[in-house]
């Protein structure tokens, strides 16, 4: 691996080892990095970092693409069922890869339940997708999920319960789900950055979950004086998640807390935390709210190509369903 990186200008065996230790295992990771990120590595100057990045981009053939090429790339997008056909219809078939989907809402609105259900559904992605579309899809090869838990709400027993509700082995789902408990924003960001290491070591990571996205940031950066610092750090975290979705054709799901809108006289009285940073970085944005009994309402209010729409789903012992 070190021999490959030495093809870059100014990279000898010693520098190559430092790059590998920092997680830069291939040209693509270097090509999509910033000068500031590379200069954090001891012994790499801004000038050397700039040369490495430019050379890596040339080797990866990064640049403009035609609309036809992008359309071809979009054909590799796959979808994962939420468990609710009505909600899947709003999403034109299910949760989409190469994108970040946000579910925001008050406590008890179903955010974490959707995250748990997604881990289960990943193990039968091909089967569920075939049921929805009426066509036979090639099943994912031993897909795995990463669940970064920032609020201590991941429950393996709930995953098993949902799996049994679909007639599959709950132990299989747990075996294929990597869970990390993040107690602060630095841990949260580090775990997200380490996902590439899991992929490089042979794990077919196809689902990444952050539950929840903003809780650690809210706890650490209090007051308006720290808002700019919080947003910059959150922006870097979202960039990491988007890069994972794009480079590895995986689905990224994030839950988000809400805050009251004091100026809201009509309509939704809460707004998702994170402001424009999260708003611009998330591909699909949902707002969840409680309804009667076990019913929940999911409103899609931001998407690059789908209309605003609502779906009603239920949270039962067996999991998410219509």
From Swiss-Prot:
Entry-linked CDD domains: archRadA
Keyword 4Fe-4S: no
Keyword ATP-binding: yes
Binding site for ATP: 105-112
Record keywords, A-Z: ATP-binding, DNA damage, DNA recombination, DNA-binding, Nucleotide-binding
GO biological process, one term: DNA repair
Molecular function GO terms recorded: ATP binding; ATP hydrolysis activity; ATP-dependent DNA damage sensor activity; damaged DNA binding
InterPro entries on file: AAA+_ATPase, DNA_recomb/repair_Rad51_C, DNA_recomb/repair_RadA, DNA_recomb/repair_RecA-like, DNA_repair_Rad51/TF_NusA_a-hlx, Hlx-hairpin-Hlx_DNA-bd_motif, P-loop_NTPase, RecA_ATP-bd
SUPFAM superfamilies per the UniProt record, alphabetical: P-loop containing nucleoside triphosphate hydrolases, Rad51 N-terminal domain-like
Pfam families tied to this protein: HHH_5, Rad51
PANTHER family: MEIOTIC RECOMBINATION PROTEIN DMC1_LIM15 HOMOLOG (PTHR22942:SF30), RECA/RAD51/RADA DNA STRAND-PAIRING FAMILY MEMBER (PTHR22942)
Assigned protein family: Belongs to the eukaryotic RecA-like protein family.
Functional summary from the UniProt entry: Involved in DNA repair and in homologous recombination. Binds and assemble on single-stranded DNA to form a nucleoprotein filament. Hydrolyzes ATP in a ssDNA-dependent manner and promotes DNA strand exchange between homologous DNA molecules.
Protein name (Swiss-Prot/TrEMBL): DNA repair and recombination protein RadA
Organism annotation: Methanococcus maripaludis (strain C6 / ATCC BAA-1332)
Gene: radA
């Amino acid at each position: 691996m070190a021999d490959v990186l030495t093809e870059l200008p100014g990279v000898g065996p010693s520098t190559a080892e430092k790059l590998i230790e920092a997680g830069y295992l291939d040209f693509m990771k270097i090509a999509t990095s910033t000068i500031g990120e590379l200069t954090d590595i001891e012994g790499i100057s801004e000038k050397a970092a700039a040369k490495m990045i430019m050379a890596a981009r040339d080797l990866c053939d990064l640049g403009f693409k035609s609309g036809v090429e992008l359309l071809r790339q979009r054909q590799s997008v796959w979808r994962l069922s939420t468990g609710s056909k009505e909600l899947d219809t709003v999403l034109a078939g299910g949760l989409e890869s190469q994108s970040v989907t946000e579910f925001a809402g008050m406590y008890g609105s179903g955010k974490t339940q959707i995250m748990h259900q997604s881990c289960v559904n990943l193990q039968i992605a091909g089967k569920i997708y075939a049921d929805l579309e009426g066509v036979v899809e090639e099943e994912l090869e031993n897909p795995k999920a990463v669940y970064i838990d920032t609020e201590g709400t991941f429950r393996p027993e709930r995953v098993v319960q949902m799996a049994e509700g679909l007639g599959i082995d709950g132990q299989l789902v747990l075996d294929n789900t990597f869970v990390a408990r993040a107690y602060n924003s630095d841990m949260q960001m580090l775990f997200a950055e380490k996902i590439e290491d899991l992929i490089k070591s042979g794990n077919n990571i196809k689902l990444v979950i952050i539950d929840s996205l903003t809780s650690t940031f809210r706890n650490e950066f209090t007051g308006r004086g720290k808002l700019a610092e919080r947003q910059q750090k959150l922006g870097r975290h979202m960039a990491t998640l988007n890069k994972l979705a794009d480079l590895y054709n995986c689905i990224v799901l994030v839950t988000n807390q809400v805050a009251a809108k004091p100026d809201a006289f009509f309509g939704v009285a809460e707004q998702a935390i994170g402001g424009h940073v999260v708003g611009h970085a998330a591909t699909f944005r949902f707002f969840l709210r409680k309804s009667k009994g076990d019913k929940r309402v999911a409103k899609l209010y931001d998407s690059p190509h789908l209309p605003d729409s609502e779906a009603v789903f239920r949270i039962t012992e067996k999991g998410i369903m219509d």
